[in-house]
Amino acid sequence: MKNNFLRLILLLFTTAMFAQVDKVSVVSNDEGMKLVVNGKDFMINGMNWDFIPIGTNTVDANFWNKSDDIIKAGLDTEMSLLKNMNVNVIRQYTGVPAKWIKYIYEKYGIYTMLNHSFGRYGLTLDGVWTPVTIYSEARTQDYLLSEIETLVKEYKNTPGLLMYLLGNENNYGLFWQGAETEDFPDDQERINFIGESRGRPMYKLMNEAAKKIKLMDSTHPVAICNGDVLFIDIVAEECKDVDIYGTNTYRGASFTDMFKVVKEKLNKPLMFTEFGADAFNAIKNSEDQKSQAYYMVSNWKEIYENAAGLAKEDNSIGGFTFQFSDGWWKFGFDDR
């Protein structure tokens, strides 16, 4: 009798724990491609979010290492503003404790897309910092797949987790040497060479990571974050197990043929992981919120017009405005 009672308690506890975890899936039907959460269609009204006070950067802000009272105060201030503007998902990088993903979701109804940078900004391998990630190396592959496994174990049962995101325009990182924007080579042969020699191993490894995630967690989809559509043909060949194509795209007021190209090349849902415009007008050397609003409204209009069932490309599942706080800390960041 006692054993039966203990089994019942364990069953109720397990059921309650997993009942809190949302079932998120990608659905493709006659209407098009869409994201579905717990059986309901879900359009991402997203925001790139982090908490970096004035005078700090991503390295020394250490927000998640503060006391719970400080973290809660910061989240309550930020998330109340985001909720008021109908944001339903924020993009966060790894490092956020699972309990705060849960807190944000349960108090404000805002999900988290959890982003592993996947070597975008370098790795520490065998105790040595390597600023440029070589994805064809066995030790790099082992390290990243091990990190992904640890990540999924830690977060897969977290209420408020929407999906996993791999990378941050890592295809650009194949050319750039740091976090700041640099020029691309003009030589198309050089670009193609980089794509084949460095890009293909990276995308292949991303696909291996996606397979590992989905083997461990069947309730949350996996996306990659690519820079625009550079190397999309390689993505089509190597990333067949990735659920969603995420892209950082800055083309001005219109995404032009982005929806059509992604549909024809990949036949996967399209998610804008970054887009938008600055509030600072470099020509006028002054703040210009009206100009920013013009670009943002135009971009969001296209994102919605291309959602499932609206008779355009039917493959848009939403996007993440870039970004909630200013990024002035990035200037000179690589000169530390």
Language model features with spans:
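Bacterial Sec-dependent N-terminal signal peptides
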Residues: 1-20
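Conserved Rossmann-like nucleotide-binding pocket used by diverse enzymes
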Residues: 13, 17, 43, 271
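Short acidic, Pro/Gly- and aromatic-enriched capping/linker segments at domain boundaries
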Residues: 20-34
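Active-site mouth of glycoside hydrolases
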Residues: 30, 36, 40-245, 251, ...
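Short aromatic-enriched loop/helix-cap "lid" or pocket-rim segments at secondary-structure transitions
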Residues: 125-127, 175-179, 283-285, 329-335
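Non-catalytic scaffold segments within catalytic domains of secreted glycoside hydrolases
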Residues: 223-242, 247-260, 278-320
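Aromatic-lined glycan-binding groove of carbohydrate-active enzymes
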Residues: 261, 268-277
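Aromatic-rich peripheral "rim/lid" segments of glycoside hydrolase catalytic domains that contact
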Residues: 315-317, 322-336
